[in-house]
Amino acid sequence: MSEYIRNQILGIADNFKALASMAGDIEQVARICTDTLKAGNKIMFCGNGGSAADSQHLAAELVGRYKLNRPAMNALALTVDTSILTAVGNDYGYETVFSRQLEGVGRPGDLLVGLSTSGNSRNIVLAMELARRMGVRTVALTGRGGGEMKEVAEFCIAVPSDATNNIQEMHIAVGHLVCELVEREIYGG
């Protein structure tokens, strides 16, 4: 079992070495997030399953703090209100749970960040299509080459893996780097 654990950890390290080649893309996402917040707009996150949890995690880093003690930043996860999710899912279909919320709270200049390991989550694709029509910017965090989200998002980081768990690990690493860069750019440090 120790050998298996060692090999898994080395595989994770290899994934992160490959992710390092995407530093410029990560910097671009941080710039988009920083510009959004500096303009007085908000960042909205969405995802399904583990990516829903990651969406909440990243919104919390911005509203709470990542490393710096500073004022709250305007961010939210569209994955947290069970009454909205179940009402919209029941009445309109699960594929609309994010786009319906975006229609209500999104404003031109806001940013929608969609997380999906496959890049093909229909509810996120539909939300991104609506976002573009509304003047809401879009960033996709995916794996597996980007999927359909790569085609509809303004900017896509497709992390270099096809394994769901490894994609999610890299999404959190990318998200943490973005949070740190945004904090530093807006509040110094």
Curated annotation (Swiss-Prot):
Zn(2+) binds at residues 57, 61, 168, 176. It comes from the Bacteria. Its EC number is 5.3.1.28. Keywords: Carbohydrate metabolism, Cytoplasm, Isomerase, Metal-binding, Zinc. It is found in: Cytoplasm. Its cofactor is Zn(2+). The reaction produces a racemic mixture of D-glycero-alpha-D-manno-heptose 7-phosphate and D-glycero-beta-D-manno-heptose 7-phosphate. Substrate binds at residues 48-50, 61, 90-91, 116-118, 121, 168. The gene is gmhA. HAMAP family: GmhA. Binds 1 zinc ion per subunit. Catalyzes the isomerization of sedoheptulose 7-phosphate in D-glycero-D-manno-heptose 7-phosphate. Pathway: Carbohydrate biosynthesis; D-glycero-D-manno-heptose 7-phosphate biosynthesis; D-glycero-alpha-D-manno-heptose 7-phosphate and D-glycero-beta-D-manno-heptose 7-phosphate from sedoheptulose 7-phosphate: step 1/1. Belongs to the SIS family. GmhA subfamily. This is Phosphoheptose isomerase.
